[in-house]
Amino acid sequence: MISPERELDSEREVSFERSPEDDAGPEDDMGSESNMDQEDGTNPESKLSAKDKRKRIRQELCWKHDYNDFMMGLLMKLFPLEELKRYLEASDTERPLNIRTNTLKTRRKDLAQELIGLGINVDPVDWSKEGLIVYDSPVPIGATASYLGGHYILQGAGSLLPVMALAPQPEERILDLSAAPGGKTTHIAQLMKNTGVIFANDISKERCRAISANCHRLGVINTVICHKDGRAFHKLMTGFNRVLLDAPCTGTGVAIKDPSVKATKTLKDVQRCSHLQKELILSAIDCVENGGIVVYSTCSILLEENECVIDYALKRRHVKIIETGLEFGRPGFKKFEAHRFHPKMELTRRFYPHAHNTDGFFVAKLKKLSSKKKT
């Protein structure tokens, strides 16, 4: 899904360095505190103790939750300590399986009755019209007659949010710029009632086959599957009513699905993803008509992949942030350490496992005002 990675010039690297306090060695600590002691007469031991305590906590959390030091440093900047502990516990806890009803073939109520008849315990997702939570099942949930018949798709609850924010309408022309494996594409199709046209694009030819398979099983007939580099898609086709960019990311919000994320991601990985995301969001904006809508989402909770990408788009294209229409979630950051963002950044939405019982997600909704590019 992600295009071949390229080395970034130092001028283009985003700033996500750890603070000097976090990175200071013993000699740096001593020198810094000694200077402060000379100036204000305070006891350097108390300050060293506080720093040492924070470092020990960081090391303990890394050990307990299998994070590398870099990743834990980022998380400690995002959350107060007690909330960070709740986030880490929730992130390590398997959540119930979620499925999305395919309303092209059935109703959620009818699907629930079918599954209950098989001894499967389900409940509706209270903020979604299509979602069902599967608590336990005596049969493989991906091998029932209802599944094979296209009555539902396995899809995390958080993955429903970007399409809900997109709010596609019948007969529209919509682009899903990074579409594989097709969960969001088929969700868009059912909300459009199989009318209009969807262009489902992905850079990976292999993953395009997954889009095709899901469309076929779910009965989606209004979708054209494309195998192009999303960064250049605007050179091929424009004028879409709406564009969804569920961008490739580090996956920090879904570490339970890929625990290696916690131990292997580095500063360079974050920089590469952020750079790619910035290229993709400009292409997405250039693909949509004036007055059209772009929804940007990631399954990452890192600032550099979310608010920083939206801020980049605001500075280079004539777009504005608008309400997502989502009834829950935390506001995006208006300021964070040295970063100062547009006041409307609070209209973006952040989702966390410990607060919302979903995967970590970010959703932003933009409206295009003009095709002119900012310089």
Model-predicted segments: where are they?
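S-adenosylmethionine
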Residues: 1-375
